[in-house]
Amino acid sequence: MTIAVCPGSFDPVTNGHIDVITRCCRLFDEVHVVVAVNAMKKPLFTETERVDIIKHALADSGMTNYVVAWTDGLITDYCRKVDSPVIVKGLRQNGDYEAELGMALVNRHLAYVETMFLPANPVLEHISSSVVKDVARHGGDITGMVPDYVVPLLEKALR
């Protein structure tokens, strides 16, 4: 059984994230969606809230071969713990490749974990958590950028 790890800050989870996760679920026996706690970031939602939001967002995906968890440690340590040989990341055309390649090389060095890149769905490529928060913060419509469940949660968190 091949387990893949799909990490991110997911603050908030976007429809782009959900797309990558569901595609990943079609490719692997089991997918661990891991909320990675980054001490350098000030998230809107706690790690527990983000886990719950992702679980709710994936509930209607039709996928059942996923686990949602969080870690404040290295993703490679999490990979070792669950015996996963691969990390899967989505890539947009906005410079993600350079940043993600650097992390992929570090992860391979630390734990011999390979990183696979899935190109973003072109329809969702412009969406990022940062863009969603900025649009919502200024009263813009984020419908279609995030799962419907996330819209009121994000609006409340930004008040």
Curated annotation (Swiss-Prot):
Positions annotated to bind ATP: S9, F10, H17, G90, L91, R92, E100, L124, E125, H126, I127, S128, S129, S130
Enzyme class: transferase
Enzyme Commission number(s): 2.7.7.3
Catalytic reaction list: (R)-4'-phosphopantetheine + ATP + H(+) = 3'-dephospho-CoA + diphosphate
Keywords assigned by UniProt, alphabetized: ATP-binding, Coenzyme A biosynthesis, Cytoplasm, Magnesium, Nucleotide-binding, Nucleotidyltransferase, Transferase
Localization (cell): Cytoplasm
GO molecular function, one term: pantetheine-phosphate adenylyltransferase activity
Site residues (Transition state stabilizer), renumbered to this chain: H17
Recorded metabolic or biological pathway in which this protein acts: Cofactor biosynthesis; coenzyme A biosynthesis; CoA from (R)-pantothenate: step 4/5
Gene Ontology CC annotations of this record: cytoplasm
One Gene Ontology term from the biological process aspect of the record: coenzyme A biosynthetic process
Cofactor or coenzyme needed: Mg(2+)
Residues bound to substrate: S9, K41, I75, K89
InterPro entries documented for this protein: Cyt_trans-like, PPAT, Rossmann-like_a/b/a_fold
Primary residence: cytoplasm
Any Pfam family the entry gives: CTP_transf_like
Family listed: Belongs to the bacterial CoaD family.
Role, per record: Reversibly transfers an adenylyl group from ATP to 4'-phosphopantetheine, yielding dephospho-CoA (dPCoA) and pyrophosphate.
Quaternary assembly: Homohexamer.
Name the UniProt record assigns to this protein: Phosphopantetheine adenylyltransferase
Native source organism of the sequence: Bifidobacterium animalis subsp. lactis (strain AD011)
Lineage, uppermost ranks: Bacteria, Bacillati, Actinomycetota, Actinomycetes, Bifidobacteriales
Gene name of this polypeptide: coaD
